[in-house]
């Protein structure tokens, strides 16, 4: 194999298997069927009104592992990530701070990308902002109006809504019952009881212009796009239907990812927007999920400013399984710093035990639904042997460091 993300080592890992949210089981990722083909992935990016917290970092770290494993398998990877720079939280924060929303978005996007680079998260092939995709969004909304999948509400502000029943398969990605959908829909800013809507779950596609709000021209009047259609338009215009993975945090399963898929499927007439739906668990702090609205954030930039090594932050997040909801703590960071020190000490030794078996096991664990706890445990075992007993393979320490860099993204 050759580690495509680093310098060369021989060998090749097993095909990637991931938990699919819509199927509720771990199964092979479709790109593995043809190793020479291009693997495609669309992951929802940030709404740039505040700094990157560890919940963001954990999500993008999970998809970074997928990116790295695909490269290790020999795939070319087309990875697209959006920036939701048209959204109420951004406008509200900019108004509160007395700054232009575009300046706030630009500043926070720059900080986000700097944080991601510090954590050695490979950048997407395309970063695409919603404001860069207005033409494509308008085309998508227009197609849904023409087909009858969308309608204009009779109101002072003629907003456009998507019919949740426009596709027969609506609901397959989340698998949630209607009561759960309604609860999550309202929690995420939906308006199930708005007068004039055909259905409670119908989702906003185009918000007609209001005084003091940004707006763009369209054949159906000035306004701005709804949340879900932004991602559908970006994914379809950059990748197309049938992408290998649609991903993001588990808090996006419904309504965001369900509606993004439904919009795309409705326009393209396809049964599935993506072949695999992958979602990362939430990171908590102070007994609650980390979120901007709650304010219980541990910021990547703050940890870095306090002197935490970015590789240790990464290792701390990798210590838990990507799908698990879990809590961050100062003890977790301390443990990661200690582990990083041990790994670096072992990697700097003049010789060590043979690494072929441990590299094969690490690849196998990662290929099995990104089982980073088992991969780390295997590496800890090699490091313990190296530090306690040494070894006779002069190439082993450097070879293992290269593997850790390429597969886990941890720089030794």
From Swiss-Prot:
Motif ('KMSKS' region): 289-293
Reaction(s) catalysed (UniProt annotation): 1D-myo-inositol 2-amino-2-deoxy-alpha-D-glucopyranoside + L-cysteine + ATP = 1D-myo-inositol 2-(L-cysteinylamino)-2-deoxy-alpha-D-glucopyranoside + AMP + diphosphate + H(+)
Domain of life: Bacteria
Motif ('ERGGDP' region): 187-192
Residues noted as binding L-cysteinyl-5'-AMP in the record, renumbered to the chain: 44-47, 59, 82-84, 227, 249-251, 283
EC numbers on record: 6.3.1.13
Pfam family, one: tRNA-synt_1e
Single annotated GO MF: ATP binding
InterPro entries xref list: Cys-tRNA/MSH_ligase, Mycothiol_ligase_MshC, Rossmann-like_a/b/a_fold, tRNA-synt_1_cat_dom
Cofactor: binding details: Binds 1 zinc ion per subunit.
Record carries keyword Ligase: yes
CDD domains for the chain: Anticodon_Ia_Cys_like, CysRS_core
GO CC terms: cytosol
GO biological process, one term: mycothiol biosynthetic process
EC top class named in words: ligase
Chain residues that bind Zn(2+): 44, 231, 256
Short motif ('HIGH' region): ranges: 46-56
Cofactor: Zn(2+)
Keywords, sorted A to Z: ATP-binding, Ligase, Metal-binding, Nucleotide-binding, Zinc
Assembly: Monomer.
Family under the similarity heading: Belongs to the class-I aminoacyl-tRNA synthetase family. MshC subfamily.
Biological role stated in the UniProt entry: Catalyzes the ATP-dependent condensation of GlcN-Ins and L-cysteine to form L-Cys-GlcN-Ins.
Full protein name: L-cysteine:1D-myo-inositol 2-amino-2-deoxy-alpha-D-glucopyranoside ligase
Native species: Mycobacterium leprae (strain TN)
Annotated gene: mshC
């Amino acid at each position: 194999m050759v580690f495509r993300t680093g310098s060369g080592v021989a060998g090749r890992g097993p095909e990637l298997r991931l938990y699919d949210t819509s199927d509720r089981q771990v199964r092979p990722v479709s790109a593995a069927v043809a190793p020479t083909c291009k693997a495609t992935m669309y992951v929802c990016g940030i709404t740039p009104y505040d700094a990157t917290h560890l919940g963001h970092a954990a999500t993008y770290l999970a998809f970074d592992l997928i990116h790295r494993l695909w490269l290790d398998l020999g795939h070319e990877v087309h990875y697209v990530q959006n920036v939701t720079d048209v959204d109420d939280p951004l406008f509200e924060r900019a108004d509160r701070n007395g700054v232009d929303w575009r300046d706030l978005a630009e500043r926070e996007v720059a900080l986000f990308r700097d944080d991601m680079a510090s954590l050695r998260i490979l950048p997407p092939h395309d970063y695409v902002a919603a404001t860069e995709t207005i033409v494509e969004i308008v085309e998508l909304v227009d197609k849904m109006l023409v087909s009858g999948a969308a309608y204009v509400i009779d109101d002072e502000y003629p907003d456009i809504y998507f019919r949740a029943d426009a596709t027969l398969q609506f609901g397959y990605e989340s698998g949630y019952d209607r009561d759960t959908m309604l609860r999550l829909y309202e929690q995420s800013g939906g308006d199930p009881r708005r007068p004039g809507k055909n259905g409670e779950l119908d989702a906003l596609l185009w918000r007609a212009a209001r005084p003091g709000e940004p707006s763009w021209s369209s054949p159906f009047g000035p306004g701005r796009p709804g949340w879900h259609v932004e991602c559908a338009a970006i994914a379809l215009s950059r990748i197309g239907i049938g992408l290998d993975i649609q991903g993001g945090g588990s808090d996006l399963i419904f309504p965001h990812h369900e509606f993004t898929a439904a919009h795309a499927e409705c326009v393209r007439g396809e049964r599935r927007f993506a072949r695999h739906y992958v979602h990362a668990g939430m990171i908590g702090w102070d007994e609650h999920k980390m979120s901007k609205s709650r304010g219980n954030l541990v910021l990547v930039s703050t940890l870095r400013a306090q002197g935490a090594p970015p590789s240790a932050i990464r290792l701390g997040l990798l210590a838990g399984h990507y799908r698990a909801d879990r809590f961050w703590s100062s003890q977790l960071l301390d443990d990661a710093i200690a582990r990083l020190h041990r790994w670096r000490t072992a990697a700097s030794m003049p010789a060590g035990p043979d690494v072929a078996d441990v590299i094969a096991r690490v690849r196998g664990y990662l290929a099995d639904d990104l089982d980073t706890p088992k991969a780390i445990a295997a590496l800890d075992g090699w490091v313990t042997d190296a530090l306690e007993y040494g070894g006779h393979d002069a190439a082993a320490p450097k070879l293992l460091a290269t593997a850790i860099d390429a597969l886990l993204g941890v720089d030794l």
